[in-house]
């Protein structure tokens, strides 16, 4: 059913109406509309008086500093024949495959990190500021403390420089000297310790955090508890009891809400949910209030507690939301996204609470982000191949977001397009995939497609769906538009395209696809080569096409030979040997075809009966009884059942000398003896079994 003509399941007016079971009584107040209407134009007094012209001065508009550049950029479209923009600075480093693309991106990032390290290690050599206006990020950063005496100012400086160990040492020295550290400075120290888990941050800490979150996300999608644990402990940052943060927190003479909230958030971040919930109880006993960010962490901690049923966890989350109302804490987008993110762990039980959460967001006027819809998609489509009727919620989501322009509001916003296209591919819904792709190309939404890995996943799924569902001419247009300017195809992508060409009877494109495959680094992909050879050798084709197929087969044959020379690799597959020999025969390249028979013996592969009959036809066409006898010898060497039939054909269709007839007779006798021996062996095996 087309998406644009359907009514939504959870975006219907009767579901969007304010009446959910969550806990915000102020949602009925005005000013919380989901959409903000455009302001009416002011009426100018006297403007309707005949003969009087009134000038309406528009309100001042502040333009962005790069507004002109943005306007110019909007007039230029992507060049489908060029390499991705990120590689155009250095033509030597333009990749030709997905592996090279990933390697070059890592190399570029490594070079940036090396340059930053040199600049920050030797700042005195990089003092000249050539940028106008001044660009702070291009200048060296000073990471060494300048205040050497033991004072609170020195502690504040070390905290600002994110020196974890030095900050703790300075704090201890101040306590030993009898100096009282202010509550504000102590809270700043707790912030530092809780954020980095009592460990010294590395130079690429933010990059590592992002990698860890992606591993946890993939582990959640795979529902693999072991992989979740491994990803969670990947960096070795876990909350340990009696660490420096807990010690300093216990030494504080006075604590405010900020102190408790920092500790709670640090415990949740570093996998200590039970301790965080216990500390929240202490906060309530001291008649303090938590902020919205702490409640977000507590919601996550509630879902992480083990040995509790899903219903108990959901009730605990509802209790936290009620406490937010009691403490006059207004939820934000991350509150609801955290709830939806946790509900993914509840499987089928989480579907109804997820719908309630979405209704509540609309009721209090919080616009969902792309991450919100990503969590809903993951919850309702947890299986790799959902049935068409399992859930229609993806259609409601697309009805809601079509035509909208999104900006990043959540760290997981860049995962929506990947999950949406995965569902489109699973449902085999091409129209829905076009809608998702249209949303991606709306405004600057393309910036939210994510990393290089996510972009390749998205376009691979999209192109796979095109190959299965779209007409071949349209598919080829997409092929030229997307590859390689947007992404580099995997070997499976090329196989999908070959199968689409087969269905559309466009096998004349196969040699070009092989040429492209070599450019994209798939020269030694055996599955791809066997697919190409099978399509070319399966049926007879016009002579011109057979010549092109034979040239392609010769090129593929050279890859097997060069592969054996360059590395230890599997031998020729029997199917590939058969296909190449057939293609050579059909193109009239008889000499090369007969050489292929020697490869069967060399690699100890058995030729097919159909291939041997085609070879016999070729020998008959060239009136060569010697080749026919060699063919019978090959069949006899492998004790093939077709040997007897080949012998009869040679005796009947060729003019043989007496010597050749005797040789054929000997081959026939040897074949019959070997077959009788095998029959007797099988009979003895049967009798022993009885």
Question: What name fits each language-model region?
Answer:
Residues 1-690:
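A basic, Ser/Thr-enriched alpha-helical scaffold prevalent
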């Amino acid at each position: 059913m087309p998406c644009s003509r359907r009514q939504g399941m959870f975006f219907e007016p009767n579901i969007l109406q304010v009446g959910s079971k969550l806990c915000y009584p102020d949602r009925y107040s005005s000013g919380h509309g989901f959409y903000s209407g455009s302001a009416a134009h002011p009426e100018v007094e006297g403007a309707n008086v005949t003969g009087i012209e009134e000038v309406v001065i528009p309100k001042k508009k502040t333009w962005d500093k790069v507004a002109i550049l943005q306007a110019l950029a909007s007039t230029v479209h992507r060049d489908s024949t060029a390499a991705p923009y990120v590689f155009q600075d250095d033509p030597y480093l333009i990749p030709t495959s997905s592996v090279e693309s990933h390697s070059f991106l890592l190399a570029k990032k490594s070079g940036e990190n090396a340059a930053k390290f040199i600049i920050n290690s030797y700042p005195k050599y990089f003092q000249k500021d050539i940028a106008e206006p001044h660009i702070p990020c291009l200048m060296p950063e000073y990471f060494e403390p300048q205040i050497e005496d033991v004072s609170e100012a020195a502690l504040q400086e070390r905290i600002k420089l994110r020196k974890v160990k030095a900050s703790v040492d300075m704090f201890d020295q101040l306590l030993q000297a009898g100096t009282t550290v202010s509550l504000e400075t102590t809270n700043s120290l707790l912030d530092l310790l809780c954020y980095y888990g009592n460990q010294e941050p590395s130079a690429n800490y933010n990059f590592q955090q992002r990698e860890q979150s992606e591993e946890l996300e993939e582990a959640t999608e795979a529902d693999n508890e072991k992989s979740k644990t491994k990803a969670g402990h990947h960096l070795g940052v876990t909350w340990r009891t009696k660490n420096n943060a807990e010690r300093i927190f216990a030494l504080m003479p006075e604590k405010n809400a900020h102190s408790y909230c920092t500790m709670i958030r640090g415990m949740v971040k570093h996998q200590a949910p039970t301790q965080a919930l216990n500390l929240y109880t202490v906060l309530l006993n001291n008649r303090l209030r938590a902020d919205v960010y702490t409640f977000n962490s507590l919601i996550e901690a509630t879902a992480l507690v083990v040995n509790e049923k899903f219903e108990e966890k959901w009730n605990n989350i509802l209790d936290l939301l009620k406490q937010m109302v009691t403490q006059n804490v207004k939820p934000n987008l991350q509150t609801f996204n955290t709830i939806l993110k946790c509900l993914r762990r509840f499987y089928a039980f989480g579907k109804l609470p997820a719908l309630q959460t979405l209704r509540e967001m609309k009721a209090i006027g919080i616009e969902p982000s792309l991450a919100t819809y990503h969590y809903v998609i993951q919850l309702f489509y947890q299986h790799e191949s959902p049935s068409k009727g399992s859930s229609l919620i993806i259609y409601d989501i697309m009805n809601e977001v079509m035509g909208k322009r999104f900006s990043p509001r959540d760290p997981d916003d860049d995962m929506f397009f990947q999950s949406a296209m995965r569902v489109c591919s699973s449902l085999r819904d091409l129209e829905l995939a076009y809608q998702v792709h249209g949303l991606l190309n709306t405004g600057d939404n393309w910036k939210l497609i994510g990393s290089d890995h996510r972009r390749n996943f998205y376009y691979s799924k999209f192109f796979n769906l095109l190959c299965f569902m779209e007409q071949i001419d349209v598919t080829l247009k997409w092929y030229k538009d997307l590859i390689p300017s947007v992404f580099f195809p995997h070997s499976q992508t090329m196989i999908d395209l070959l199968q689409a060409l087969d269905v559309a009877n466009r096998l004349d494109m196969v040699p070009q696809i092989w040429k492209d495959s070599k450019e994209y680094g798939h020269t030694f992909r055996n599955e791809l080569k066997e697919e190409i050879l099978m399509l070319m050798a399966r049926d007879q084709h016009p002579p011109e096409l057979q010549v092109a197929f034979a040239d392609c087969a010769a090129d593929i044959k050279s890859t097997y030979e060069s592969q054996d020379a360059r590395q230890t690799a599997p031998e020729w597959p029997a199917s590939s040997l058969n296909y190449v020999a057939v293609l050579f025969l059909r193109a009239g390249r008889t000499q090369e075809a007969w050489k292929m028979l020697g490869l069967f013996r060399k690699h100890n592969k058995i030729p097919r009966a159909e291939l041997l009959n085609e070879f016999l036809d070729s020998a008959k066409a060239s009136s060569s009884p010697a080749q026919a006898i060699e063919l019978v010898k090959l069949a006899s060497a492998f004790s093939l059942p077709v040997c007897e039939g080949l012998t009869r054909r040679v005796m009947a269709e060729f003019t043989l000398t007496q010597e050749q007839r005797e040789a054929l007779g000997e081959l026939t006798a040897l074949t019959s003896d070997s077959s009788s021996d095998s029959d007797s062996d099988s009979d003895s095996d049967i009798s022993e079994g009885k």
